[in-house]
């Protein structure tokens, strides 16, 4: 009886301890080129906020439970001085190595909200365009991953091609309600269908049919840039 009573007192504490554990994100660069990984929740950096990743390198960050609207992305063709100030051709976040805000399009985005009523929510988004192929998967059991690894840049419509590389979203280029959904009412367009055809797992426009994956709270994750490069090496 005493043991049962002790369990009932300890159970809420153990549950709270589980739900309060920071999630681990391993960010891996399998591209043949250097990228500058970034992690932010919009108003502040996540962990260090950003880091250079040469081909084959990885960076592990810890993200606090309850984080809502976090994003991880790759920046390309960057230059930073010793103070961490500089510029990137895609994904630039105000000229900082350690991002405190979200990046400038085009960016392929790994998006997540952690421990929302005991659940994690993850997705990949092309709403802000595409710059680097990506896989976003749990490293613990309980849910599947999502991937956008098609050659979007190579097939990008001429009007969406970004001068610094990557493929812009239509809202960034045209700035109209049809593409930006500023009225709260919009449907798929020829450009969103282009993204959806190549990456069905990813959001293609603001009101796209949800492709969010629900995972158990306190799961750990891996974000891989250029995931198919790894598969080719393993063959």
UniProtKB/Swiss-Prot annotation:
The keyword Signal applies. It is found in: Cytoplasmic vesicle. Residues 1-22 form the signal peptide. It holds the Pfam family Thaumatin. It comes from the Eukaryota. SUPFAM superfamilies: Osmotin, thaumatin-like protein. Residues 230-235 form a propeptide. Its main location: cytoplasm. Disulfide bonds join 31-226, 78-88, 93-99, 143-215, 148-199, 156-167, 171-180, 181-186. PANTHER family: OS03G0233200 PROTEIN. Taste-modifying protein; intensely sweet-tasting. It is 100000 times sweeter than sucrose on a molar basis. Belongs to the thaumatin family. This is Thaumatin I. It comes from Thaumatococcus daniellii (Katemfe).
């Amino acid at each position: 009886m005493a043991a049962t009573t002790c369990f009932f007192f300890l159970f809420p504490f153990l549950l709270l301890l589980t739900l309060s554990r920071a999630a681990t994100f391993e960010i891996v660069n399998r591209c043949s080129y250097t990228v500058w990984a970034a992690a932010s929740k919009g108003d502040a950096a996540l962990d260090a906020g950003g880091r250079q990743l040469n081909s084959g390198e990885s960076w592990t960050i810890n993200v606090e439970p309850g984080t809502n609207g976090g994003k991880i992305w790759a920046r390309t063709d960057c230059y930073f001085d010793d103070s961490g100030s500089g510029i990137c051709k895609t994904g630039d976040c105000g000229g900082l190595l350690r991002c405190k805000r979200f990046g400038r399009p085009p960016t392929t985005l790994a998006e997540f909200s952690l421990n929302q009523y005991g659940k994690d929510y993850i997705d990949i988004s092309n709403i802000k365009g595409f710059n680097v192929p990506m896989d976003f998967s749990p490293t613990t059991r309980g849910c599947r991953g999502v991937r956008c690894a098609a050659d979007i840049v190579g097939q990008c419509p001429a009007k969406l091609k970004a001068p610094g590389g990557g493929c812009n979203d239509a809202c960034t280029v045209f700035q109209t309600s049809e593409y930006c959904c500023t009225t709260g009412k919009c449907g798929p367009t020829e450009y969103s269908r282009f993204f959806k055809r190549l990456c069905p797992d990813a959001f293609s426009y603001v009101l796209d049919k949800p492709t969010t994956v629900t995972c158990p709270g306190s799961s750990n994750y891996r974000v891989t840039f250029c995931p198919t490069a790894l598969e080719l090496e393993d063959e």
